[in-house]
Amino acid sequence: MQHGMYQYKVYEVDLDEVRPNEVSDDEDEMSDMYNMDDYGMDDADVFDDIESILKDAVIPDPQIDTFELEKCMNNFSKFITNADLEYKSYQEDGVRWCISKEITTNPLFDVRGGLIADEMGLGKTILMIGAIVSNPVVEPTLVVLPVALLEQWADQLFKTTGTKPYVYHGTNKKKCSIESLSNQMCVLTTYNAVAIKKKQGEKNILHEVNWGRVVFDEAHHLRNKTTGIFTGALALKHTYVWLITGTPVQNKKRDFYNLCEILRIPASIYKTKDGLVNIRNSVVLRRTKKQIGLILPAVVETVVNVRWESEREKCLARDIHNSLNLYHRTIEENDEEKEIKQATFSNNVLTQMCRAKQSCIGLLTETHLENLQQEGVLSRPVKEYMEVIQEENFSKINAVVNKVLDAKDNGCGKIIFTNYHRESDIIQKRLNDGGMTNTVIYDGRLLQSKKKQVLCEKHDALIIQIQTGCEGLNLQANYSEIYFVAPHWNPSVEDQAVARCHRIGQTKVVNVYRFEMDNLKNEENITMDNYVNVVQEKKRVIVRQLYQEA
């Protein structure tokens, strides 16, 4: 990829396939690092099949019992009134669309359900609850979702329907029988609960129940078919199936193909040009805020370029980045391209990339440095670099903390997205030392019983580990400023994170600040921040091409 005077080589590694299981806090942001397209971004014809989406599709008219449909829509009207919800015409249209897919007598591809891919912040949860209530089924409904959203869904269901769902999670799993689950109106569970572990290969009680409806919220968790989660989801028995995600394509076209498999659409359909058109037009509901006329306060994005304050800090980062050779420098002279420096990666490239990111925020340990020294990476003694790290005075952390403290009295709640536990701890301590004491950390260390309390309370600053709290949370009431300490490999994760604030109910302009380190040596050696941005843009190209027809 050409970017200014540099040409970057983006290495194609699908880390979800290499390491499909949970990864440590030290490297959890790496799981979505590449996941590039199957065919490679350099192929001239990589998007040929996507271009065909622009053509008109011929789809048979669905056969729907209009009397049954209107009866269901009357149920929806009662639901809105009884739940004391604000009527929104686009949500009614969405519920009507969902019910028509469930009750049609000739569903395309034999799919009774579909993919709800409305833009983040439009209220997909309420839409789905409305559909569940409006078209009651004899068998129970199973909702599969990230563990962080269990309580939010349970509260929303009880608030709007007066019925408490059964939460199949934790100790509750031991109390269940097939009969007890079958007698529930709605059951909530997690993606890990439906997973079929490869070593055991055994199904669990959830796979024995005949579900009337299965709903996968944040369905992009199913994008990797090599995982036990995907296998377990595919094994569930159901009449209707719904996928809910505002980001159905995160890294590559195969993300969308795998969601089609969950809908049980044959590969012979979704991998053909005409089939892709028909799928998009018949089983996918995708609407943006602009399309439905929803006007929210603006999102103002600011990139904060951070200069290196310490030569020793910069030297440490340069040593590690030099070992990666992340760039191909190209120099043009007399219209002739000269030698392109070839990038060479060591066998532990993924760990090295993680270390390069950590070097920008001072999170390297003595063990990390000793390993790097053994590999011949460091130009100075470990002791000298440890002195730098122990000072906890790194340029990027300073920039983030100073920016937040400068705005501490402006009346806007602040969300700071981090990658590492230690990073969150340092930022919180520095903010407290600077007089901002009403701060809290939301990450995997926080007990589930405490998470609801943290989210309901208003804090001056909420520090969130991005993989823990980037999706599903409603934070628009208390927060309108977002700080990304570093870019994430997956741009959809950042989009989801911004949508925690920029959604229905937000009354303030949402300011987003992205912190990026300056390059290391006369702009010849890019930092990981710059490199991640290149990877992000390649992934956004895929998403834009797939959504072009929308």
Predicted feature locations:
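SF2 helicase motor core recognition
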Residues: 197, 251-252, 424-426, 451, ...
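Inter-lobe coupling linker of SF2 helicases/translocases
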Residues: 188-189, 193, 203-208, 228-238, ...
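Conserved pre-motif I regulatory segment
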Residues: 68-115
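Conserved Walker A/P-loop ATP-binding site and its immediately adjacent core
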Residues: 138-159, 420
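Walker A/P-loop NTP-binding motif
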Residues: 99-103, 125-139
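Conserved Helicase C-terminal RecA-like lobe
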Residues: 68, 109-113, 119, 127, ...
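Conserved helicase ATPase motor motifs in RecA-like P-loop NTPase domains
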Residues: 120, 239-252
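A conserved SF2-helicase RecA2
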Residues: 489-498, 502-550
